[in-house]
Each structure stands twice: as C-alpha cells, then as structure tokens.
Amino acid sequence: MRLVKQEYVLDGLDCSNCARKIENGVKGIKGINGCAVNFAASTLTVSADGKEEQWVTNKVEKKVKSIDPHVTVRQKHIKKSADDGYRNRMVNMLIRMAAAVILGAAAYLVQSGTIEFFLFLGAYLIIGGDIIIRAVKNIIRGQVFDEHFLMALATIGAFLIQQYPEGVAVMLFYQIGELFQGAAVSRSRKSISALMDIRPDYANLKTKNGIEQVSSEDVQTGDIIVVNPGESIPLDGKVVQGSAMVDTSALTGESVPRKAAEGQDVMSGFINQNGVLHIEVTKGYQESAVSKILDLVQNASSRKARTENFITKFAKYYTPAVVIIAVLLAFVPPLVLSGAALSDWVYRALIFLVISCPCALVVSIPLGFFGGIGAASKAGVLVKGSNYLEALNQVKYAVFDKTGTLTKGSFEVTEIKPAEGFTKDRLLEAAAYAELHSQHPIAESVRKAYGKMLSSDEIESYEEISGHGIFAKVNGTEILAGNKKLMEREQIEDVPDENAGTIVHVAVDQRYAGAIIIADEIKEDAAQAVADLKSLGIKQTAMLTGDSKQTGEAVGKQLGIGEVYAELLPQDKVAQVEALEAKLLPSEKLIFVGDGINDTPVLARADIGVAMGGLGSDAAVEAADIVLMTDQPSKIAEAIRIAKRTRRIVWQNIGFALGVKAIFLILGAFGIATMWEAVFSDVGVTLLAVANAMRVMRLKNK
C-alpha cells in the first residue's frame, strides 16, 4: 500500500495549546495513521496509507479550520510571506487598541453611570470581542479550558462586580501580550529556521545554450552544474573541472575550509570560497545531503522529550484545577467568614483565572528543545528527536566500536611474516586473492600492498565467514585468510601468537602460510573525546572490537578506555551491549558510537545509537538516533554539552514560570495582587521564558 506523507505550514499558529489540539484532531481523522505538529517551526506532518494527496490535504484543511479558524493550512512548497499576515494583524490590533483607549478615557470624563458602563462595554467589545467569540466557539466544540475561556471569564467577571476599568485593562494588556508573544515566537522561529536554512536557492545548470539559473529540484543526475565563488553547492556531486577551497561548516560544524579538486566528491550545502567548480550531479534533490539533514532535523519534533510530554499533561490538568480553586475561592470564604464581601473574593478568584494560563511553559519548552536541536545541527550533530537530546543528559556508559570510530580505518600492511616454505610474495598473493571481493578496509590494504593485477576468473569459489574471515579456491588451491578463530575452526596447525596490530592469518591447502600484520592509526581527537566524556560525568567507557585481545587492549590503554571487549563476532556486539545495559540503573542510559559499516544492529539496540561519518550509510542513518556529520568522536561530548545546556534552560523556564505563578496565586488569594499585576506577570513570564529558551542557540561550544 502506498504511503502518502505530506508536510504543511500552519500560517497564523501562535498558540501552543491550539497546536496540541490540531495534532490530536488530525490524528483522529479516519485514514490518517500519523501526525505531528511542530509548534516551533509551525509545521504539520501527516502520513496516510493508500490515500491521494489531495484527499489528505482536504481533510487536514477542514479539520484545522474547525479547530482554529485563524490558522491557514499551506503546503510547504507554496511560498508565502509570513510578515504580511503578522503586519496586518498588528495594524488591526493597534487601531482597536486606540479606539478602546479613547472610549475608556471618555468613560472617566462622563458623570452618568449608565453612559460610563456603555463606554467601557464598547471599549471591551472592541478590544476583546474576538476573544469572546473564540471562547464561545471552543465551548460549543467541547474545548472549555483554554486561554480564551479564562480571559473571557475573568474579564466578564470583572464587569459583573462593576470593576469596568480593570475588565477593559486586563483584556487590553492580554491582547498586547499576545501581540508581543506572537512577535517573540515568530522571531524565535526565524532564528531557528535561519540557523538550519542551508538549502541553496538555485543551481547554475550547464546547457547547450550556456549557463541557466534553475531550481535545484529541476536538476537531474548526470547534469553538470557550475558553482561560482561565494555560492553554495546546491546538489551532491563529483568535481569534474576546477578546484577551490570549500566551507563545510554548515554541514559539519568545522570552521577550517578544505580543498575540493577534480575527481573529489562534494556535498550540497558546502560553500565555494574561491575558484569555479564544474560538478557532475550524482544525487537528485531529494537524496542530497541538505535535504536529508533538513528532513531529519525538522521531523525531530515528532519524537518529543519526556519534559515536553510532562508539560503537555501538566497544562491539561493545571488549568481546570486552578479554575476549580478560583470558584471555591470566590464562594466558600463569604459563606464561612463573617463580614467577608462576595465581591472582594470574586475579585481574588478572577486573579486566579488570569494567572492560570500555562502559556509560558507550553510555548517556551518546545522552542527550547527545537533550539537545542538547531544548535546541534549547526555543530554537525543531527539529533532525530528532542527525546534523544534529553536522553543524552542521562548517559553514564559510552561504548565505542574501534575500527573507523576511534581509529581511522585506513589500514596499511606494516609487516609480512611468511611461514616456513612460503615467500613473502607468495603469502601476499594468496591473501590478495582471498580478499579480492571483500569491501572491508583490511582487504583493501592487502590488495594495495600486493599491487599487482588480480583476475577474478581464477577464483573458482568464494565464501565470507562472518566474524572469522574468507575461504577461496583459486586455480584448485584452497586459501583461508582471517583471524586466529578461523585457523582454529579449520584445525590449521602451527599458528603462532602475534601481539602487534591487526593480524591476517593465511593458510594454503590446510597448511599455515604465515601472517600479515596490519596497522590502523588512532584518530587525533580520540583520546580527547574519551577524556571529555569523563569530565562530563560519564561513569564508564568501553570499546568493542573483533580484533585480538592484545590489539584491543593496546588501543584501549592508549585512549584511556575503561573496558575492552575483543575478538567479538558481529552478533556478539549486540549481546555485549545488552549485558552492559543490564548494569545500569533505570535512570541511566548507554550510548553506542559506530562508523555505520556493520554496526547497524548495535545502533538500533543501544539506548542511544550514534552513527559517525555523515549520511554515507542509509542503513546506519535509519538505525541511529543521532548522526555525526564528521568522523570526529569528539563531537559526542559536544552533543552532550548542548543537551545539558538545553535541559538547564528548559528547567530554568519551568522553575521561573511556576515560581512566579505560585507567588501571584498566593498574593491574589490574600488580596495583595491586582488583576493588572496578574496579567502583567503572565505576559512578562511568557516573554522572558521565550527569550531565555533562545539562549541555547547563542551559547558557544567549548
């Protein structure tokens, strides 16, 4: 069955509570099996099996309109200026505010109580009529406890106890606050979008008629594009002419440019700093690095952090609870306390209603996490969900694969040790034929060391033995090449113990032929990566390798790794990770870092799987929870630092918002605070929380 996946922009979505309602509403549409609203990015992603795209769009538009008529659904590829809508709303609100202020001022000047009432009522309806209408519509739909209902109830209550000026003023300042909040959220969204907006706008396509500027989506695989100095490379490809220094920071987070010359691969998103590059396109727009990165980051909102889910549930119960307390506060004290005036206690209850809206939390928390994901992507770390970003704070066990992760994986033959009766050339030739069809870096190093032509026609049979090595029959000669386990399995005698490097043992016709010693260089930042993790509170580090125990322990000792598990088959690595996870407390997490070549099962099994080396292996990217765009293990510590900053800022907002609300609830209950102060505190807390949430993007990584 065909899966339809559509992404929409929700123009006018400035209410996080509305975002939650839209997500739940669209999820309830029959035929739609997946939905996620990203409030921070104003996007809605929907998936449906076996449905036409237009059917999905019509259903979504109808449902969104029924939930919030002010939100317009737009397909993502259709461009629209968001500023125009906001500017129109602002002008409209300023006119209404001016009219309300004039009527309110006139009410103070008249002597008649009736005229005063109608002037204040007119001012109230001008400034708050839309809030009343939305509250009534939501009540009809069964959506009672939202900010519109609370403000309508509080201000109408003020009119009922003849506090006309405060009823108008509270609605006026609430609308001003909404305007500022909308501006703050809009600015935050633009900041995050700008941070991640690495998609080139156009491509210079080389045609028979010269160079034509076209959309990147219109370029086909095999086309030649021209990238001038200062331009961004629009599509993945291979340089066929020219050379230049390219800035890769948008993808990798690395500030040092690297050279791109003829024959080298380049990725979309790289910026040409000098020279002119002619590039043959190797991947279409949807398969390019930039598209994959943006897709990963923007879809991260569908995997919400536990804190986000907690705040959503908290808001669901917090608002009704405060309303119930407000009702009790209004009517119980006058019944049990002698001399207590009903109007005084109703006024105090109205303060409860004003302060009960949890906007500061439900707006700033998603922005904080999305900002953290954006900051991580700018540093070359792609986090697939805010749940994984939050989980990085709980990591206590860091487990690394060795080859290609902590070492460069660029093997070189350093020594050839033939057994008695064999020459170095004969030993190397036998190993090269055995490794002819293998794609493993060790096999490539053996073939490179042999350096002569190899004919696959001479190979009569070939078998890769997982975790052991290779069996090949060449011109009637049986060759075994692999580790010591392979020699033991095939009962090869006289196999010596070798301690240095990675060893390929070779046997010819069941007779031991010798050993080839291969060295793998440790990455420059590997030791620092392990040290940084320990400084961040990681309790234990471990390394998994299929190499010999001596080789593994030598690398582990050099890097300061606590535990080394060697001579592991691919399936043994999964079992070992499970055994390590069993040692952890329920609140602790294990992170596994692999290079993505053969680590897919372990990446999928670990609490947090991290694939290194960018988007090269689709299977690894699919299985991993976090993708590093470079081959630097030190990026792990950087990701954890960003995660810790994000958590710190999110909990600052939670503590600040709840603290201020608690103070004003107490002050309101004792009759110390006024409705004016309550609405100022509510608006102020929200604006400060949004501003604080964006700090995560401005903090420099150390």
UniProtKB/Swiss-Prot annotation:
<dbReference type="InterPro" id="IPR036412">
    <property type="entry name" value="HAD-like_sf"/>
</dbReference>
<feature type="transmembrane region" description="Helical">
    <location>
        <begin position="321"/>
        <end position="339"/>
    </location>
</feature>
<dbReference type="GO" id="GO:0016463">
    <property type="term" value="F:P-type zinc transporter activity"/>
</dbReference>
<feature type="binding site">
    <location>
        <position position="15"/>
    </location>
    <ligand>
        <name>Zn(2+)</name>
    </ligand>
</feature>
<keyword id="KW-0170">Cobalt</keyword>
<comment type="function">
    <text>Couples the hydrolysis of ATP with the transport of cadmium, zinc and cobalt out of the cell. Does not seem to transport copper.</text>
</comment>
<comment type="similarity">
    <text>Belongs to the cation transport ATPase (P-type) (TC 3.A.3) family. Type IB subfamily.</text>
</comment>
<dbReference type="GO" id="GO:0006824">
    <property type="term" value="P:cobalt ion transport"/>
</dbReference>
<dbReference type="InterPro" id="IPR008250">
    <property type="entry name" value="ATPase_P-typ_transduc_dom_A_sf"/>
</dbReference>
<dbReference type="Pfam" id="PF00122">
    <property type="entry name" value="E1-E2_ATPase"/>
</dbReference>
<dbReference type="InterPro" id="IPR051014">
    <property type="entry name" value="Cation_Transport_ATPase_IB"/>
</dbReference>
<feature type="transmembrane region" description="Helical">
    <location>
        <begin position="87"/>
        <end position="107"/>
    </location>
</feature>
<keyword id="KW-1133">Transmembrane helix</keyword>
<keyword id="KW-0862">Zinc</keyword>
<keyword id="KW-0812">Transmembrane</keyword>
<keyword id="KW-0813">Transport</keyword>
<feature type="transmembrane region" description="Helical">
    <location>
        <begin position="649"/>
        <end position="670"/>
    </location>
</feature>
<feature type="topological domain" description="Cytoplasmic">
    <location>
        <begin position="364"/>
        <end position="648"/>
    </location>
</feature>
<keyword id="KW-0547">Nucleotide-binding</keyword>
<feature type="topological domain" description="Extracellular">
    <location>
        <begin position="164"/>
        <end position="166"/>
    </location>
</feature>
<dbReference type="InterPro" id="IPR023298">
    <property type="entry name" value="ATPase_P-typ_TM_dom_sf"/>
</dbReference>
<dbReference type="GO" id="GO:0015086">
    <property type="term" value="F:cadmium ion transmembrane transporter activity"/>
</dbReference>
<feature type="binding site">
    <location>
        <position position="15"/>
    </location>
    <ligand>
        <name>Co(2+)</name>
    </ligand>
</feature>
<feature type="topological domain" description="Cytoplasmic">
    <location>
        <begin position="695"/>
        <end position="702"/>
    </location>
</feature>
<dbReference type="InterPro" id="IPR017969">
    <property type="entry name" value="Heavy-metal-associated_CS"/>
</dbReference>
<feature type="binding site">
    <location>
        <position position="18"/>
    </location>
    <ligand>
        <name>Cd(2+)</name>
    </ligand>
</feature>
<dbReference type="GO" id="GO:0006825">
    <property type="term" value="P:copper ion transport"/>
</dbReference>
<keyword id="KW-1003">Cell membrane</keyword>
<keyword id="KW-0186">Copper</keyword>
<dbReference type="InterPro" id="IPR006121">
    <property type="entry name" value="HMA_dom"/>
</dbReference>
<dbReference type="Pfam" id="PF00702">
    <property type="entry name" value="Hydrolase"/>
</dbReference>
<feature type="binding site">
    <location>
        <position position="599"/>
    </location>
    <ligand>
        <name>Mg(2+)</name>
    </ligand>
</feature>
<feature type="transmembrane region" description="Helical">
    <location>
        <begin position="144"/>
        <end position="163"/>
    </location>
</feature>
<dbReference type="GO" id="GO:0016020">
    <property type="term" value="C:membrane"/>
</dbReference>
<dbReference type="InterPro" id="IPR044492">
    <property type="entry name" value="P_typ_ATPase_HD_dom"/>
</dbReference>
<dbReference type="GO" id="GO:0030001">
    <property type="term" value="P:metal ion transport"/>
</dbReference>
<keyword id="KW-0472">Membrane</keyword>
<dbReference type="GO" id="GO:0005886">
    <property type="term" value="C:plasma membrane"/>
</dbReference>
<feature type="domain" description="HMA">
    <location>
        <begin position="4"/>
        <end position="72"/>
    </location>
</feature>
<dbReference type="GO" id="GO:0046686">
    <property type="term" value="P:response to cadmium ion"/>
</dbReference>
<dbReference type="GO" id="GO:0008551">
    <property type="term" value="F:P-type cadmium transporter activity"/>
</dbReference>
<feature type="transmembrane region" description="Helical">
    <location>
        <begin position="346"/>
        <end position="363"/>
    </location>
</feature>
